[in-house]
């Protein structure tokens, strides 16, 4: 794992690239097509802001979360309050998501406040020490304002996506009427340019998401005693258990809707387990974790990581173990 300073610089540079490329291309498009695209951009921004405000209610419905009282799970509240105090933030609301996949996520908006949700699958998979490390990771996301930052970073590619498809459909309309063929060709060109920019910005946004996962991991290590080993063991158990759950249940596709929120990507769990299967899980925990430092990520795995919101599991575990 790179140093905290390098992580911050990499995240800042990536965000600057996303903003810079977006500003440049939007300026070029507006210079050709005029202010009509401002309406499209403003509409997309308003829709995304509305989505951000109401997203917690949607997440609660999809993942069947419920608020739990301090008397119901005092040990979880004690962990959350301690980690939040060490992190210097107000204790978020604690919720349980009634789903079998072992995972956790942080979310919230000005309408709901900050929340940390733990799945019932996680409670059945990890011990309290590992749960504390996972909570430390999620609180790190809240402290770093990752929900807001990633919403903003994802908004810019979305603008180009909708602009691109709007222009392409507009060009088809012109072609169908046999009018303004010159304008139709220009719309197609700018539309395809917008789609290309969308894909480029999406790759940058995914990279930013992976950096912020490392940043949240580092935060957990800083506020949880022995957090590096606890979180590494927790991640291994999450991957192994998630792969089994996804094989057992065929109707979990909808639970991936907000997978970027999770501490581990449930969609890659089966592949991640393949990566880990080279290890002997009957070994002691120390021997198991020590083995990860000797492995290399293959070229195919590096390519797959480019399109993931989360770091490759082997790279992530190595990064954690380097902090022990």
What are these language model-derived features?
Residues 56, 80, 118, 133-141, ...:
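Active-site recognition of the HExxH zinc-binding catalytic motif
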Residues 218-237, 241, 245-324:
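C-terminal capping/extension segments of zinc metalloprotease domains
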Residues 1-109, 153-210, 214, 238-244, ...:
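Hydrophobic or amphipathic, alpha-helical segments that drive membrane association/targeting
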């Amino acid at each position: 794992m790179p140093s905290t300073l390098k992580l911050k610089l990499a995240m800042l540079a990536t965000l600057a690239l996303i903003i810079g490329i977006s500003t440049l291309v939007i300026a070029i498009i507006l210079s050709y097509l005029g202010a009509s695209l401002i309406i499209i951009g403003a509409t997309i921004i308003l829709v995304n802001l509305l989505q951000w405000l109401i997203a917690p209610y949607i997440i609660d419905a999809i993942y069947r979360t419920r608020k739990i009282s301090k008397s119901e799970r005092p040990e979880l509240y004690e962990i959350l309050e301690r980690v939040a105090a060490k992190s210097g933030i107000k204790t978020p609301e604690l919720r349980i998501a009634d789903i079998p996949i072992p995972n956790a996520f942080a979310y919230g908006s000005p309408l709901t406040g900050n929340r940390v949700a733990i799945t019932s699958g996680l409670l059945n998979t990890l011990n309290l020490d590992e749960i504390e490390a996972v909570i430390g990771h999620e609180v790190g996301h809240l402290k770093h304002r990752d929900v807001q930052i990633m919403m903003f970073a994802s908004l810019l590619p979305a603008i180009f996506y909708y602009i691109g498809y709007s222009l392409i459909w507009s060009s088809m309309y012109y072609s169908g009427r046999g009018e303004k063929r010159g304008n139709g060709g220009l719309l197609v060109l700018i539309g395809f340019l917008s789609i290309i920019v969308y894909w480029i910005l999406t790759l940058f946004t995914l990279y930013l998401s992976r950096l912020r996962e490392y940043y949240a991991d580092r935060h957990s290590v800083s506020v949880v005693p022995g957090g590096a080993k606890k979180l590494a063991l927790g991640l291994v158990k999450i991957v192994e258990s998630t792969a089994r759950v996804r094989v057992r249940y065929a109707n979990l596709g909808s639970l991936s809707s907000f997978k970027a929120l999770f501490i581990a990507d449930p969609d890659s769990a089966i592949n991640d387990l393949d990566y880990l299967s080279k290890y002997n899980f009957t070994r002691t925990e120390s021997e198991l974790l020590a083995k990860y430092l000797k492995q290399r990520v293959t070229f195919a795995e590096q390519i797959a990581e480019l399109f993931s919101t989360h770091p490759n599991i082997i790279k992530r575990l190595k990064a954690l173990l380097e902090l022990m």
